[in-house]
Swiss-Prot record:
More about this protein: SAH is a product of SAM methyltransferases and is known to be a feedback inhibitor of these enzymes. As a result of this inhibition, organisms have evolved efficient enzymes to metabolize SAH via different pathways. The pathway found in methanogens differs from the canonical pathway, it uses the deamination of S-adenosyl-L-homocysteine to form S-inosyl-L-homocysteine for the regeneration of SAM from S-adenosyl-L-homocysteine. 5'-deoxyadenosine is a radical SAM enzyme reaction product which strongly inhibits radical SAM enzymes.
EC number, as in UniProt: 3.5.4.41, 3.5.4.31, 3.5.4.4, 3.5.4.28
Cofactor-binding details, from the entry: Binds 1 zinc ion per subunit.
Keywords: Hydrolase, Metal-binding, Zinc
Organism annotation: Methanococcus maripaludis (strain C6 / ATCC BAA-1332)
Cofactor(s) of this protein: Zn(2+)
Cited Pfam families: Amidohydro_1
Catalytic activity: 5'-deoxyadenosine + H2O + H(+) = 5'-deoxyinosine + NH4(+); S-adenosyl-L-homocysteine + H2O + H(+) = S-inosyl-L-homocysteine + NH4(+); S-methyl-5'-thioadenosine + H2O + H(+) = S-methyl-5'-thioinosine + NH4(+); adenosine + H2O + H(+) = inosine + NH4(+)
Signal peptide range: none
Residues holding substrate: 86, 178, 208, 294
Family membership noted in the UniProt record: Belongs to the metallo-dependent hydrolases superfamily. MTA/SAH deaminase family.
GO biological process per UniProt: S-adenosylmethionine biosynthetic process
Binding, Zn(2+): 57, 59, 205, 294
Protein's UniProt name: 5'-deoxyadenosine deaminase
Length: 422
């Protein structure tokens, strides 16, 4: 058990008790009510306790790609830099990159993430060791080639079986077709069928740039969401669509009808000059917006608090509307909405929810005065957290990783980068 004493919880000084991996009780809890020998007691004095953040779109091993290709557009970034480096990937490199990325996420308050990448056994190994929660998809790209399509689907299905057989509630599977401009109708059809067979979500890039939209229009005569909807890609599945920057009214209507979850990546979209997602329109149509960092190659960090702030600010400016996205809405994008998208029973601090939460020391200049903490968490916090609990276990204590030797990870990451870069 874990007992947090005297923390600011939901705006009040309270205690919180964890039994197993569940928040059992919130309120005034005496130490005499629990067994001292079986309970870890956390002093929450001067701390605010918040739900863990949920990163709904990333490529965690790309922590090793941080800073390799800045200040260029997406297609040049992909074809000229990222894809050539990814051709050198191996299990050791992906393992090192995932360790580095998950440490970065945990130390900035993220307790769960939704990933699309390669060498899933290495990702799973690192996730298991760090203690973070994850939904993982093998990234499928067939480039309209039948032989490659069969290989990609085989690997995706094997990955789902591998994750299923882990029987680990922290690690769940998904299907990750890259995007409509890199995936054939056949692989997308098969993706929907597999998602229904395995009862897993689909994670796909959609409408990130004008160039990719034009590619789909030239090939099919209609826009990406219209194209996928024409053959039932969104039917009877939970779909998380990353980016969604350039959307027509008809596409927004499809998204609304099909209950699409949007993984909004404001920082990556700005850095690659892709554009700004019409989030206000999405909200007006009751479309659920969540937040992702994307990979470190296009961000260049995995601090979801930066995405929360960017989401709260950018739409005010673009729409000349100070309440386009409020601080409360932006915070829920990164917590409650993300948890719902990944079907995780978290995102709020309530009895019966999973014990995925974060403690932040408020004795910092940028978090003072403490009376305005809800505002500070969105507009002034830098993301450095003190304690992180995931699935009822302490994984970060006083800013230090509990399960992992950080110095060793940094050495592994430097070695892996040299192998990638040469």
């Amino acid at each position: 058990m874990i007992l947090v004493k005297d923390a600011n919880i939901n705006g009040k000084k309270q205690d919180l008790l964890v039994e197993g991996n569940i928040i059992k009780k919130i309120g005034n809890i005496s130490i005499s009510e629990v067994s001292k020998d079986e309970t870890e007691i956390i002093d929450g004095k001067n701390c605010v306790l918040i739900p863990g953040l949920v990163n709904t779109h990333t490529h965690v091993p790309m922590s090793l790609f941080r800073g390799v290709a800045d200040d260029i557009p997406l297609m040049e970034w992909l074809s000229g830099h990222i894809w050539p480096m990814e051709s050198k990937l191996n299990e050791k490199i992906v393992y090192a990159g995932t360790l580095l990325g998950t440490i970065e996420m945990i130390k900035s308050g993220t307790t769960a993430f939704n990933d699309m990448y390669f060498f899933l056994d290495s990702i799973i190994k690192a996730v298991d060791e760090t203690g973070i929660r994850s939904t993982i998809a093998y990234g499928m790209i067939d480039l309209f080639d039948e032989e490659k399509r069969e290989k990609e689907l085989k690997t995706a299905k094997e990955s789902l079986e591998m994750i299923k057989n882990l029987n680990n509630s922290r690690i769940t599977g998904a299907l990750g077709p890259h995007a409509p401009y890199t995936c054939s109708k056949e692989i997308l059809d098969s993706t929907n069928a597999l998602a229904r067979e395995y009862n897993v979500p689909i994670h796909i890039h959609m409408n990130e740039t004008l160039d990719e939209i034009n590619q789909v229009v030239e090939k099919t005569g209609i826009r990406p969401f219209e194209y996928l909807n024409s053959f039932g890609f969104f039917d009877n599945v939970n779909t998380i669509c990353a980016h969604c920057v350039h959307l027509s009214d008809s596409e927004i209507q499809i998204m609304k009808e099909k209950n699409i979850f949007v993984a909004h990546n404001p920082v990556s979209n700005l850095k690659l000059a892709s554009g700004v997602s019409p989030v206000l329109k999405l909200l007006e149509n009751n479309i659920s917006v969540t937040l992702g960092t994307d990979g470190c190659g296009s961000n260049n960090n995995m601090n979801l608090f930066e995405e929360i702030k960017a989401a709260a600010l950018i739409h005010k400016g673009v729409n000349l509307n100070p309440v386009a996205v409020t601080a409360k809405e932006a915070f829920e994008f990164g917590t409650k909405n993300g948890a719902k998208a990944l079907n995780i029973n978290s995102g709020e601090i309530k009895e019966g929810k999973l014990a995925d939460f974060v403690l932040i020391n408020m004795k910092k200049p940028y978090l003072t005065p403490k009376e305005n903490i809800e505002s500070h968490l969105v507009y002034s916090f830098n993301g450095v957290v003190d304690t992180v609990v995931i699935d009822g276990k302490i994984v970060l204590n006083d800013g230090k990783m509990v399960n992992i030797d950080e110095e060793k990870v940094y050495e592994l990451a430097e070695e892996a980068y040299l192998e990638l870069a040469n």
